[in-house]
Amino acid sequence: MPKVSQLASYLVYSYENHTGARFGDNELRLQTMLYFAQRECLAVVGVPLFEGSFEGWEEGPVLPELHFFFEEGYDPFEPLEMKKLTEREQFILDRVVFAYGQYEGWYLSDLARRETSWRNSRPSVAEEVTEPKLLELADIREDAKKVRIYDTLFDVYLDELEEFEGGVLEP
C-alpha cells in the first residue's frame, strides 16, 4: 500500500489537472476527500485504499499524519511518479475528484459528519471537547454499502444495470 502522503499528493494533482484550478492549502477539503476515497475504495473493491486511521474531529474525519500536510510535508506530485500508484488507486482518487472536487471544504465536512462512522466516533463528545476517537473501519464499510457506484463510461449507476447473462465477447 502506498503512503497516505503519496495519495494526498496525487489527489491534489488530480484535482488541479481535472479542474484547472489550484487546490490551495485547503486541509479540510483534503482530509474529507481522502475519507471519501477510503469509503469509495471499500465500496468498489472491498479493501481499504490505505492503512491509517481517521480520527473523529469536530470538523470531520481527520488523518492525524496529514494534519500539517501543506505546511510541513507537501511535495507536489510529479507525473513521472505515476508508477508509484496502481491504476486502481489513481482511479479511486480520480472518481473522488470528479464526485466531490466541485465542493468547498466545509460542505464536504458537513457531508462526512453525516456518515455513521463519524457519528459513532463522537457519540457523547461535547462539541467543545477535542478528544477524538478513531473511526472504525467496520463503520466505514457500513457507510460504503450506501454508496451508489456510477459508471462514467456508460453514464449510469451500476445498480441500474440489468445483470449481464451472456458470455464474454471475443474480438
What are these regions (language model features)?
Residues 1-171:
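Domain-edge interaction signal
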